[in-house]
Amino acid sequence: MIQGTLYIVSAPSGAGKSSLIQALLKTQPLYDTQVSVSHTTRAMRPGENQGEHYFFITEEAFRQMIDNNEFLEHARVFDNYYGTSRKVIEETLASGVDVFLDIDWQGAQQIRKKMPSARSIFILPPSKEELCRRLRGRGQDSEDIIEKRMDQAVAEMVHYNEYDYLIVNDDFNTALADLHTIIRSERLHRERQAQRHDALISKLLAD
C-alpha cells in the first residue's frame, strides 16, 4: 500500500485556506484525499456541524486527551484549544489517502518534528486591506475580534518561510490551480511513482 502524504496548510484567518481546501476536495475522490477534522474547545459557529468541521469538546476533555498523549499536535489559539488526533492521521495515511491539516504555525512546527515527510503550504492574502475586508465580510466577529485577528495575522505570516510552498490568494481560481499543481507534483515524486509502478519497473529492468 502506498503511504498517503500529509499536507500542512496554514494561513492567517481570512486568507482563504479553508475555502481552498474545500474546493480542492470537491475535485478529489474521497479515497484519494481527505481533510483532517480537529478537536477544539471553541464554541460552534452557525452552519457548523459536530464531527464535520470540528469535534467540539470541553476544555476538561481536551486536557484529558493531552494527558493521554492522543494528539499529534495541539495549540492554544484565540483563547481556545485545537488539536489533531494522532491515531486518525496515522491510520488514514497508512490506507494510502492524502490528508490535509488546516492548522496554524504552532501546530505545523509540532507536526514537522514528528512527521518530517509532511509537506507544508502557506497561503498569503494579497494585502492587509483585503484581509481586513474579508474578515468583515464574513459577519462573524466584532470589530474588537477583527482587530485582534489582524494583529495575529502578522504574527502568523512571519513564519511563512518555514513552509515548503507559498500561495498568494489574490484570485481564488488561480490559487486553487496552484494548490492542484502542488498535489499533482507530489504524487509524481519518484518514491511514490516507484511504489505505484513497481511491477512495471521490474518488467522493464528484467534481463
Curated annotation (Swiss-Prot):
Gene: gmk
GO cellular component: cytosol
The protein's name in its UniProt record: Guanylate kinase
Reaction catalysis annotation: GMP + ATP = GDP + ADP
Subcellular location, record wording: Cytoplasm
Higher taxonomy: Bacteria, Pseudomonadati, Pseudomonadota, Gammaproteobacteria, Enterobacterales
Pfam families: Guanylate_kin
Assigned keywords, A-Z: ATP-binding, Cytoplasm, Kinase, Nucleotide-binding, Transferase
CDD domains in the cross-refs: GMPK
Role summary: Essential for recycling GMP and indirectly, cGMP.
EC number: 2.7.4.8
Amino-acid positions noted as binding ATP in the UniProt annotation, renumbered to this chain: A11, P12, S13, G14, A15, G16, K17, S18
An MF annotation (GO) of this entry: guanylate kinase activity
Residue stretches making up the Guanylate kinase-like domain: 4-184
Calcium among keywords: no
Class of this enzyme: transferase
Record has Cytoplasm as a keyword: yes
Transmembrane segments: none
Top-level taxonomic group: Bacteria
Coarse class of the protein's main subcellular location: cytoplasm
Matching NCBIfam families: guanyl_kin (TIGR03263)
Similarity-based family: Belongs to the guanylate kinase family.
